[in-house]
From Swiss-Prot:
<feature type="repeat" description="MVP 4">
    <location>
        <begin position="224"/>
        <end position="278"/>
    </location>
</feature>
<dbReference type="GO" id="GO:0005737">
    <property type="term" value="C:cytoplasm"/>
</dbReference>
<dbReference type="InterPro" id="IPR043179">
    <property type="entry name" value="Vault_2_sf"/>
</dbReference>
<dbReference type="Pfam" id="PF17795">
    <property type="entry name" value="Vault_3"/>
</dbReference>
<comment type="subunit">
    <text>The vault ribonucleoprotein particle is a huge (400 A x 670 A) cage structure of 12.9 MDa. It consists of a dimer of half-vaults, with each half-vault comprising 39 identical major vault protein (MVP) chains, PARP4 and one or more vault RNAs (vRNAs).</text>
</comment>
<dbReference type="InterPro" id="IPR021870">
    <property type="entry name" value="MVP_shoulder"/>
</dbReference>
<feature type="repeat" description="MVP 3">
    <location>
        <begin position="171"/>
        <end position="223"/>
    </location>
</feature>
<feature type="repeat" description="MVP 7">
    <location>
        <begin position="381"/>
        <end position="433"/>
    </location>
</feature>
<keyword id="KW-0597">Phosphoprotein</keyword>
<dbReference type="InterPro" id="IPR040989">
    <property type="entry name" value="Vault_3"/>
</dbReference>
<feature type="repeat" description="MVP 2">
    <location>
        <begin position="119"/>
        <end position="170"/>
    </location>
</feature>
<feature type="repeat" description="MVP 1">
    <location>
        <begin position="54"/>
        <end position="118"/>
    </location>
</feature>
<keyword id="KW-0539">Nucleus</keyword>
<dbReference type="InterPro" id="IPR041139">
    <property type="entry name" value="MVP_rep_dom"/>
</dbReference>
<protein>
    <recommendedName>
        <fullName>Major vault protein</fullName>
    </recommendedName>
</protein>
<dbReference type="Pfam" id="PF17794">
    <property type="entry name" value="Vault_2"/>
</dbReference>
<feature type="repeat" description="MVP 6">
    <location>
        <begin position="329"/>
        <end position="380"/>
    </location>
</feature>
Length: 833
């Protein structure tokens, strides 16, 4: 400020610098100060620092004051400062800042409000410099809590760490606290650093600086049906005054307290629900707790209702609540003693077994183990089970009567090869090898007796490996396997050409049936042909006493086909192609069946090894194996047919032309004869004319009349003869044309008949193939399956109508209308007027 006269108001001040001594002094108003030449005013008059009530300010580098409160000056006259220190000043008279003093500003404000500590709140403060307070020395680092409600008076030596809210403890809750350092809490209990405890007093709890609040613990409500299972983290004495060891488990029930708050050294294991038993229920408790509170491991305890209880720690109910076993009249229980005890006066040894038969109610005892609940097994006359005696090991089959296993009997499972299991589930006991299911799983109950329906005109061989002898069962029949019997599985050739092991079957069809095979033969002129043969066969078996040799040939189909193929190849090899092509059927039948003593072809081929008889053989097709040869043969056949047809047409045409020429010759001859007769008639006419001229002399009129009459007669006769000649010529021409037409129609009819015969043979072959296909499909599907398919539609319709719940129904169509006029009135019972 450059003015020499400075007017300073009340509660204002300025700093004057003496340029001679370099000392700055403070001048407070109200005053009018005249500045000297060697003085400089550092700033315009500033207001003094005013601290209102409930406020404070912090002055840095405060001046030093004596006991009277006056400012202490240095020898140079400069105000003495406590550099680096600070001073907190509260409400009072406004004061100026001496040179070197600074006002600590926070958020742009030098004067701050005193902090108000509300109720249930405290300030966590820390001493940063030793000081003495009320004859008590407070060391640096000391922390304490200033609890509200009050106004916090700050000190330079103390800093506020944080504001702490009190935690409200409600009923059925507790506050878990942990000690940070060793100290004595408010209740006078010494605490160790890291120790945890619960504060259960209701209301607001303001923690001390030595404590850390871990959280509120909610109490668990207990009832008659709910208990709390706890475990001790360390050894301590619980709230009920009971000493607990580390790892020990116990339960708190409603008898102990309605609400339990888990203590600091308690860990909740689980909520335990009460087990309620009715009069018809019981439980088996494993490892029960005795009167001393210890588990009796390995023991069991049976408890029967009516009762309600809690499972103690260590006790288990593996099987849960069970119903009292009600044993019916047709039921029994298989029991086993696990230790020695007396049962109604009878001594039971460990491991002994017995059966308790109904009707009764049974609850197992601790000394008894229930092995099985057995029931009477109802068996039809065609049903059975396998039973094994566990004492002797004997296995027997029980068939056709209700049966209950005895004490020393068990159901015996008869295991069959997987292939036999799959054949048993197939419709007719046969299956193609290519159609086998690799993932097949049998659903047969192994203890049930094995049954198989032998079809009509079929046979099954069963081998008893204990007696080492087979038996044959002829169908229709039901086979039941004894415990030591097995099926004989047939592995037959199949397909065209025959492939070994293509078909597996449990039953042997006795026939008559047929088989087809394809073989390749070679004639003497090296023509290779593929023949498709079909033959009928059957087994000549005695149905009263069937022979075992029927099953002596495992693959009778393959053996038969090989034999026939060998004979056919040998016979064809001695014939040329043309001869074999013309007489193929006769050559093959003679080769297969052979000839008798008289040279006649036999009627069948018999295999004496298994009584297998082939009765007929048919050549279904014969074609060259070489494609070019086959095409050439077809072309030659077609060419032969065309040549034959054209030759017949030429012969017919030649005959017609010959007949036409003969008719024309006869016609020309007839014309010549007619001309001769005409000339003869003319000659006679001339003679008559001469006579008439002669008569003319006698009388012209008479002669003229007579001449005219004779001329007219002659003319009429000539015309009649000409008409007859024309009619005869027309008849001859018509007959020739008719013969020509008849010959043409005969040739066309013969050609049509040959075409029809070819078409009929093709249709017959197709029909036979289709019939064979249908027959094979029917054989594969089976009669029972076809009957089920035929019945499925009507049965489904009947079930559909039955499910509608109709008492009656009427089915009609538009051609037979039904008059329902007035039906509604009759249904509601109103009489018609």
């Amino acid at each position: 400020m450059s003015d020499s006269v400075i007017r300073i108001k009340r509660y204002h001040y300025i700093h004057i610098l003496d340029n001679n001594t370099n000392v700055t002094r403070t001048i407070s108003g109200p005053v009018v100060y005249t500045r000297k030449e060697h003085e400089t005013c550092l700033f315009d008059p500033c207001p003094c620092v005013s601290v209102p009530p409930r406020h404070y300010c912090v002055v840095k580098n405060p001046c030093v004051r004596d006991e009277a409160g006056e400012v202490v000056l240095e020898s140079s006259g400069q105000v003495k400062l406590r550099l680096g220190d600070a001073e907190i000043r509260f409400e009072g008279e406004p004061f100026p800042l001496y040179p070197g003093e600074e006002l600590d500003c926070r958020d742009g404000k030098g004067v701050q409000k005193l902090q108000l500590i509300p109720p249930n709140t405290g300030l966590h403060v820390r001493c940063v410099r030793d000081f003495k307070d009320a004859d008590r020395l407070v060391g640096a680092g000391t922390e304490w809590m200033v609890a509200g409600p009050q106004t916090y008076i700050p000190r330079v030596e103390v800093v506020v760490v944080e504001e702490v809210k009190a935690t409200v403890i409600y009923p059925n809750t507790a506050l878990m606290v942990q000690a940070n350092v060793n100290f004595t809490d408010r209740g006078g209990v010494p605490r160790v650093a890291g120790e945890k405890w619960l504060v259960r007093a209701l209301g607001a709890y303001l923690q001390s600086v030595e404590e850390t609040v871990l959280g509120l613990i909610q109490g668990t409500m207990l009832s008659d049906l709910k208990a709390l299972r706890l475990s001790a983290v360390r050894s301590f004495t619980d709230v009920y005054g009971k000493g607990r060891r580390a790892g020990e488990q116990w339960q708190v029930t409603l008898k102990d307290a309605p609400v339990h708050i888990i203590d600091a050294y308690e860990m909740k294991v689980a909520d335990v629900a009460a087990v309620s038993l009715s009069a018809k229920e019981y439980v088996i408790i494993h490892h029960p707790v005795d009167d001393t509170g210890h588990n009796r491991f390995g023991e069991t305890l049976v408890r029967r209702g009516e009762c309600t209880f809690f499972l103690q720690p260590g006790e288990t109910m593996p099987r849960g609540v069970e119903q009292v076993l009600v044993v019916g009249k047709e039921e029994a229980l298989l029991l086993e003693a696990v230790c020695e005890y007396r049962d109604r006066g009878e001594k039971r040894q460990p491991g002994s077994r017995w059966m308790v038969r109904g009707p009764l109610e049974y609850i197992p005892a601790n000394e008894v183990k229930l092995l099985e609940h057995r029931r009477m097994m109802a068996l039809d006359k065609n049903e059975g089970i396998y039973v094994m005696n566990t004492t002797t090991g004997e296995v027997r089959a029980v068939i056709g009567k209700p049966y209950m296993l005895d004490v020393n009997e068990v159901l015996w499972e008869k295991h069959l090869p997987l292939a036999v299991e799959e054949l048993l589930e197939s419709p007719n006991g046969s299956i193609q090898t290519s159609e086998r299911n690799p993932g097949f799983v049998s659903h047969r109950e192994k203890y049930r007796i094995v049954r198989f329906n032998v079809q009509h005109n079929a046979a099954v061989q069963i081998y008893d490996y204990r007696k080492k002898q087979p038996r044959i069962v002829l169908g229709p029949n039901l086979v039941m396997l004894a415990p030591h019997e097995e099926f004989t599985v047939l592995s037959l050739s199949g397909g065209t050409p025959k492939v070994p092991n293509s078909l597996q079957s449990l039953q042997l069809f006795l026939g008559p049936r047929f088989s087809s095979d394809t073989i390749v033969v070679e004639t003497s002129d090296h023509a290779r042909l593929r023949l498709r043969l079909s033959y009928n066969w059957y087994f000549d078996i005695d149905r009263v006493n069937p022979s075992q040799r029927t099953f002596s040939v495992p693959d009778f189909i393959g053996d038969c086909c090989k034999t026939i193929a060998s004979r056919v190849r040998g016979a064809v090899a001695s014939e040329d192609f043309d001869s074999f092509h013309r007489n193929s059927a006769k050559i093959i039948r003679t080769a297969v069946f052979g000839v008798d003593e008289t040279g006649e072809t036999k009627k069948n081929l018999r295999f004496t090894a298994n009584d297998f008889v082939v009765t007929n053989i048919d050549v279904q097709s014969s074609e060259p194996t070489d494609e070019k040869t086959r095409d050439s043969l077809q072309k030659s056949v077609q060419l032969a047919i065309e040549i034959t047809t054209k030759s017949q047409e030429a012969a017919a045409r030649h005959g017609n032309e010959l007949k036409d020429q003969e008719a024309k010759g006869q016609l020309e001859r007839q014309k010549l004869l007619d001309k001769i007769e005409v000339e003869n008639a003319r000659t006679k006419w001339l003679e008559l004319q001469a006579k008439s001229e002669a008569v003319q002399a006698s009388g012209q009129s008479v002669a003229e009349a007579k001449a005219r009459a004779e001329a007219l007669l002659i003319e009429v006769r000539s015309e009649m003869q000409q008409a007859e000649m024309r009619a005869r010529a027309y008849r001859i021409s018509a007959e020739a044309e008719l013969q020509k037409l008849q010959q043409r129609q005969a040739l066309e009819l013969e050609y049509t008949q040959r075409q029809n015969e070819i078409d009929v043979s093709k249709a017959r072959a197709a029909a036979e193939a289709e019939a064979e296909k249908v027959k094979r499909m029917v054989d594969c599907i089976g009669r029972d399956t076809l009957v089920a398919i035929a019945r499925a539609g009507p049965e489904t319709q009947v079930k559909l109508l039955s499910s509608l719940g109709l008492k009656g129904y009427l089915i009609t169509d538009g051609n037979s209308p039904v008059n329902l006029f007035g039906t509604a009135q009759g249904m509601i019972g109103e009489p018609k007027k």
